[in-house]
């Protein structure tokens, strides 16, 4: 076998490999000998079929299998010997001229093919013991608890019909009938009757509720939306749809009195018990916000201390995912780049920078996890699936079946678990100090696109 490196340019490498016909023929013959004991051919006793006869019948298909296996084995050997870690799948280019292909399959000509790869760069990890990370912590006040209870009361408020001819406004509950289509064709789950939609609740597809503002009872509108790219149903994810929607009733919200009686409607003994419950719930939210702040600060530190050229193909892939999402969101909302005080070119440049950061951080976290033998167990993934199912009451079986039959979706659940375990590992080594902050500071809306 002859291996010639024809390109070595940064992270890109290409090789031309030539495998002698005799080597391929010997491997194919070995497969045919093994096949002799497995096939049944009329006129021959089991195991007594001559290899030459088998070659006439199965020669080409066995040689094709042999070539495929040889290419995979050879590529693996080449990459391993050079210490390459692949960023993407190898791109193999085979002979295409029919006469040459026939000779190779007949074992009469050497196999010459090329393979192009992009590799992961060598990464020198920083000393995490030198990292200083601030941990913002906020106290929960009585006012925070009262505000949370008010939000709960608003969510459980009753509604009363609006006057005849009144139009729907934000906060109103609109009862609708709708029929959804994609490219003019109805789809499963796209039809509903007597469905209550609270405008501004953000419980429906982005853009659906906003387009109900101003609708009157009996009025029909065509609502144009785009399903999120991470929508549970893969067949609908990222697709534009139209919903012919008719309002059959419009109701305005009524204020709810917060007292012991309100608490009892929620299954609690008193308002004091409700306050205890809300304080515990807020404690969880504050803890999660602190975690996100610490994680963001740590990722920023990793970004600062690990500057290297990431594989272009991985950056392109990450950029395309984000850009497709941006375009779908803009199409759904009807916004333009001018509305965001930018241009398409500037936006692309910004998102490509974010894509580069994400890819580099992903490679760094992977390197840390690999070197420190950090893994995600099947039990941890199962617990994540269960939590996801619990978050969608009434659809638990659908969620469970979706992940059980979709390895890619399961991998998407595994990735953040792995990332969090690596982050925890680094935080154990870093110098983490608490800092008291206000609730507003803890929950301030930072631009998190790059995280």
UniProtKB/Swiss-Prot annotation:
<comment type="similarity">
    <text>Belongs to the FKBP-type PPIase family. Tig subfamily.</text>
</comment>
<comment type="function">
    <text>Involved in protein export. Acts as a chaperone by maintaining the newly synthesized protein in an open conformation. Functions as a peptidyl-prolyl cis-trans isomerase.</text>
</comment>
<dbReference type="InterPro" id="IPR005215">
    <property type="entry name" value="Trig_fac"/>
</dbReference>
<dbReference type="Pfam" id="PF05698">
    <property type="entry name" value="Trigger_C"/>
</dbReference>
<dbReference type="GO" id="GO:0015031">
    <property type="term" value="P:protein transport"/>
</dbReference>
<dbReference type="GO" id="GO:0005737">
    <property type="term" value="C:cytoplasm"/>
</dbReference>
<dbReference type="Pfam" id="PF05697">
    <property type="entry name" value="Trigger_N"/>
</dbReference>
<dbReference type="GO" id="GO:0043335">
    <property type="term" value="P:protein unfolding"/>
</dbReference>
<dbReference type="GO" id="GO:0061077">
    <property type="term" value="P:chaperone-mediated protein folding"/>
</dbReference>
<dbReference type="GO" id="GO:0003755">
    <property type="term" value="F:peptidyl-prolyl cis-trans isomerase activity"/>
</dbReference>
<keyword id="KW-0132">Cell division</keyword>
<protein>
    <recommendedName>
        <fullName>Trigger factor</fullName>
        <ecNumber>5.2.1.8</ecNumber>
    </recommendedName>
</protein>
<dbReference type="GO" id="GO:0044183">
    <property type="term" value="F:protein folding chaperone"/>
</dbReference>
<dbReference type="InterPro" id="IPR036611">
    <property type="entry name" value="Trigger_fac_ribosome-bd_sf"/>
</dbReference>
<dbReference type="GO" id="GO:0043022">
    <property type="term" value="F:ribosome binding"/>
</dbReference>
<dbReference type="InterPro" id="IPR001179">
    <property type="entry name" value="PPIase_FKBP_dom"/>
</dbReference>
<keyword id="KW-0963">Cytoplasm</keyword>
<keyword id="KW-0413">Isomerase</keyword>
<dbReference type="InterPro" id="IPR008880">
    <property type="entry name" value="Trigger_fac_C"/>
</dbReference>
<dbReference type="InterPro" id="IPR037041">
    <property type="entry name" value="Trigger_fac_C_sf"/>
</dbReference>
<dbReference type="InterPro" id="IPR027304">
    <property type="entry name" value="Trigger_fact/SurA_dom_sf"/>
</dbReference>
<dbReference type="GO" id="GO:0051301">
    <property type="term" value="P:cell division"/>
</dbReference>
<keyword id="KW-0131">Cell cycle</keyword>
<dbReference type="GO" id="GO:0051083">
    <property type="term" value="P:'de novo' cotranslational protein folding"/>
</dbReference>
<feature type="domain" description="PPIase FKBP-type">
    <location>
        <begin position="171"/>
        <end position="256"/>
    </location>
</feature>
<dbReference type="InterPro" id="IPR008881">
    <property type="entry name" value="Trigger_fac_ribosome-bd_bac"/>
</dbReference>
<keyword id="KW-0697">Rotamase</keyword>
<keyword id="KW-0143">Chaperone</keyword>
<dbReference type="Pfam" id="PF00254">
    <property type="entry name" value="FKBP_C"/>
</dbReference>
<dbReference type="InterPro" id="IPR046357">
    <property type="entry name" value="PPIase_dom_sf"/>
</dbReference>
């Amino acid at each position: 076998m002859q291996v010639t490196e024809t390109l070595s340019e940064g992270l890109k490498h290409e090789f031309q490999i030539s495998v002698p016909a005799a080597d391929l023929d010997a491997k194919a013959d070995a497969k045919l000998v093994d096949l002799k004991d497995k096939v049944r051919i009329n006129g021959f006793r089991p195991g007594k079929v001559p290899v030459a006869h088998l070659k006439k019948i199965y020669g080409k298909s066995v040689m094709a299998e042999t070539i495929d296996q040889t290419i995979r084995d050879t590529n693996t050997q080449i990459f391993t010997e050079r210490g390459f870690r692949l960023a993407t799948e190898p791109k193999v280019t085979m002979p295409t001229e029919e006469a040459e292909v026939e000779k190779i399959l007949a074992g009469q000509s050497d196999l010459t093919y090329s393979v192009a790869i992009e590799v992961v760069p060598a990464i020198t990890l920083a000393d995490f013991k030198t990292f200083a990370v601030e941990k913002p912590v906020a106290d929960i006040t009585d006012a925070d608890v009262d505000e949370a209870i008010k939000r709960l009361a608003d969510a459980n408020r009753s509604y009363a019909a609006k006057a005849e001819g009144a139009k729907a406004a934000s906060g109103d509950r609109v009862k609708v009938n709708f029929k959804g289509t994609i490219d003019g064709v109805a789809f499963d789950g796209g039809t509903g009757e007597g469905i209550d939609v609270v405008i501004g609740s953000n419980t429906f597809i982005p853009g659906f509720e906003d387009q109900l503002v101003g609708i009157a009872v009996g009025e029909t509108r065509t609502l144009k939306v785009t399903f999120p790219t991470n929508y549970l149903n893969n067949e609908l994810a990222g697709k534009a749809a139209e919903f012919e929607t008719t309002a059959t009733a419009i109701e305005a919200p009524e204020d709810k009195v917060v007292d012991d009686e309100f608490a009892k409607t929620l299954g609690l003994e008193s308002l004091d018990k409700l306050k205890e419950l809300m304080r515990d719930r807020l404690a969880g939210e504050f803890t999660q916000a602190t975690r996100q702040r610490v994680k963001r600060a740590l990722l920023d530190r990793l970004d600062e201390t690990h500057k290297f050229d990431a594989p272009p193909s991985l950056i392109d892939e990450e950029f395309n995912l984000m850009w497709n999402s941006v375009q779908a969101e803009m199409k759904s909302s009807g916004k333009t780049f001018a509305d965001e005080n930018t241009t398409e070119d500037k936006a692309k440049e910004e998102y490509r920078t974010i894509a580069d950061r994400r890819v580099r951080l992903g490679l760094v976290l992977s390197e840390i996890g690999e070197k420190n033998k950090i893994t995600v167990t099947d039990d941890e993934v199962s617990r994540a699936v269960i939590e996801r199912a619990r978050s969608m009451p009434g659809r638990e079986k659908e969620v469970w079946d979706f992940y059980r039959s979709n390895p890619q979706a399961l991998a998407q659940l595994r990735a953040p678990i792995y990332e969090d375990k690596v982050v925890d590992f680094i935080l154990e080594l870093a110098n983490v100090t608490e800092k008291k902050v206000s609730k507003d500071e803890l929950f301030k809306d930072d631009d998190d696109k790059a995280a």
